[in-house]
């Protein structure tokens, strides 16, 4: 959905689901929020996003019961800056895993280790609607399959706007991540 139908490429990058065409028209010429990782301006775009304030606070606590592989996630936050369309705000919670090895990866010869690979979406695809007119909280639980390496996993939460008609109106308002389990010594 974020790509143009004729231009799907990897590797690619997206910063906060934001189209930077006003400042970087040559790199966002398709009016989408995605550009190639070969862009020479990635550092500039990254710095611009680092300077963008968070519109909501976001805190997350992750607990895992190693015996049952049951994961418990508690998230809380509140609006800290005005948001144009508060009715469109949603929270997304994902589980990711690092160091997933594959021998086949287009554009790479030999093996390749994937980082931040999406393992499970704990909310609906486009996030669960939240009311940011007051402090919000969310409690989620899930069981990790035995073949997932919890020491390589993160819980990622982000709050974003959602506009089903305009892909450039889905800005991320804040994000956080926590490790699922500590690496063994």
What kind of region is each of these model predictions?
Residues 1-185:
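Short, conserved sequence motifs used for protein processing/export or organelle targeting and
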């Amino acid at each position: 959905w974020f790509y143009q139908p004729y231009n799907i490429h990897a590797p690619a990058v997206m910063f906060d689901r934001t189209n930077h065409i006003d400042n970087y028209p040559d790199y966002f010429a398709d009016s989408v929020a995605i550009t190639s990782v070969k862009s020479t301006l990635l550092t500039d775009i990254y710095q611009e996003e680092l300077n963008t304030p968070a519109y909501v606070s976001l805190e997350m606590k992750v607990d895992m019961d190693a015996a049952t592989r049951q994961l418990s996630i508690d998230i809380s936050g509140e609006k800290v800056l005005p948001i144009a369309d508060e009715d469109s705000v949603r929270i997304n919670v994902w589980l990711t895993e690092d160091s997933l090895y594959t021998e086949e990866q287009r554009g790479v010869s030999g093996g390749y280790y994937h980082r931040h690979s999406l393992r499970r979406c704990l909310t609906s695809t486009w996030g669960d609607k939240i009311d940011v007119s007051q402090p919000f909280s969310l409690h989620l639980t899930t069981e990790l399959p035995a073949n997932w390496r919890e020491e390589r996993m993160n819980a990622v939460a982000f709050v974003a706007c959602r506009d089903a008609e305009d892909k450039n109106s889905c800005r991320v308002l804040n994000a956080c991540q926590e490790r699922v389990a500590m690496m063994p010594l």
